[in-house]
Amino acid sequence: MTEAMNRVAIRPLSRILPARLRGDDPDKIEKENLKIRHEQLRDGERVRSNIRLLLIIVMFACIYTAIGARLAMLASSQPAEPVAQSNNSLIFARRADIVDRRGRILATNLETYALYVETRHLVDPRNTANKLADLFDDLNANDLYSQFTSKRKFLWIKKKLSPEQMQAVHDIGEPGLRFGPRETRLYPNGALASHILGGASFGKEGVKSAEIVGVAGIEKTFDSQLRDPSYSRKPLKLTIDLSIQAAVEHVLEGGMRLLNAKGAAAILMEVDTGRVISLASLPDFDPNHRPGLPVRGSADDSPLFNKAIQGVYELGSTFKIFTVAQALELELVDPKTKINTKGPIRIGGHKINDYRNNGPELPVWQVITESSNLGTARIAKMIGPEKQREFLSSLGFTKPTSIEMIEASGGKPLLPKRWNELETMTISYGHGLSATPLHLATGYATLANGGRLVKPTLLEEEKLGLGQQIISKEVAKNSLAMLRGVVTEGTASLADVNGYFVAGKTGTADKPSAQGGYDKEKNITSFASIFPIHEPKYVLVVTLDEAQDTSGPEPKRTAGWTAVPVSAEIIARVAPLLGLRPKFDNKSSVGVTLSNWQE
């Protein structure tokens, strides 16, 4: 009743009667009014729909903006601990292989797995810690349990696993133990050429992949190239010959053990190109399990220390040939010039003498074959400090070598603070200036190739060529003849390998004492050799640290009894591998023999 009273009439009588009096049709008027009202209703509904749609669009835009902002924040952040969800996208380029001069693999990549723990999924932390400690000797069960029950959500256990280790971990049956695929660096030859290759480790890491970075040796020197995707299919080729490297290391290790040496180094180099065919340092290490840096003791006692390019030693009488070669070049002497060998020489509170009495005088060639300190010192006095320094500098003895290894910068020669007459005389026979075995090999290569400087290299594709002329071909030829005489008539008779005409010079130098001066019971012995003398192709330098031959009643510590026989065995082993055919005609094609100078 109330609802009916409140209705508004669609056709009020007050409007109908006036309309009829005017002659209008009330039905048409009402129909038109209804049409207008319906259109107004539709327009209102359309406006309300548009408003609702706009609100929905604005709402979704706000939601997507918030999500995008959150994703951007997560992408740019660096979490304290890696998590699986944020690392799946880490993809690193494959590291290029390293091969020897014949294309044999020295370093490559191996697909493996890393082991990590998501602690929230651990069912039995104590049992898991115990089982892992049983599997890995370097893990402690209590330490693991403490980490498993801490607030950490993620924990690395092992960065790389062998298939056997992976299976053993899988057998534990713990859901919180997870495996992440990755590539690791593999050195298939173990410790062979370890000081050349150096080693690699992991840089940026994710649970699905890891970046391999070089930490030492060639791996570090050429790290950016090896990681460059454009080089990943092209291996880095070295000058090293794997077979020869193995032979050198085998003989060197045996000699080191037989002679009770503390360490050893050997370098085999082409005299015309500077290509290093073999470079060894002992003790060595396995780059697959590279040891940590030493925390105590001397750095050169560590197996990581490369004695061939980092070890700086007084190289003894091996230096004498440089003194004589310079004097010949300056025309101060000729091979037959008689040199006063009376001793001792007293200068500046120091006394210079020979190992044994060589008489009152010797010709220059015999100063070398008899290894006379007195004769060499007097020849050096003729040369003078300034010219001696210039000559040794031209041979590279005053700065680190340029070989392509990051460690080479550490092999900086130790020069005298004051290069006066006393230092000039002692340096002439290898005391007072310390250099690396690689310096010595480079200097002897210059003598062997006719007097031109060479640059030592480990890169097979390096553009090579002889450098500046340091000494004349005639002086180089005479120097080789004298070095051959050291083997046939002098202190290196054990180096006369049948068929290969070896030339060379021995060197024995006492080691500096921690209390000052020199320790007479400890020395460095070296032998620098060139072969074959009729067509010089290779130089071999062998250096032994604290070696001594104890086969007789008295220990023998000189190079003739230590470094020389080791060098001879290396030459006998590697010469056939180098393609050298022995000659047995006993003719020297140097063009000069000691008989030319003998009276």
Residue ranges and their predicted role:
Residues 1-293, 312, 386-398, 551-599:
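Periplasmic/cell-envelope proteins involved in peptidoglycan metabolism and beta-lactam response
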Residues 107, 266, 271-317, 322-547, ...:
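Beta-lactam-recognizing serine transpeptidase/beta-lactamase-like catalytic domain environment
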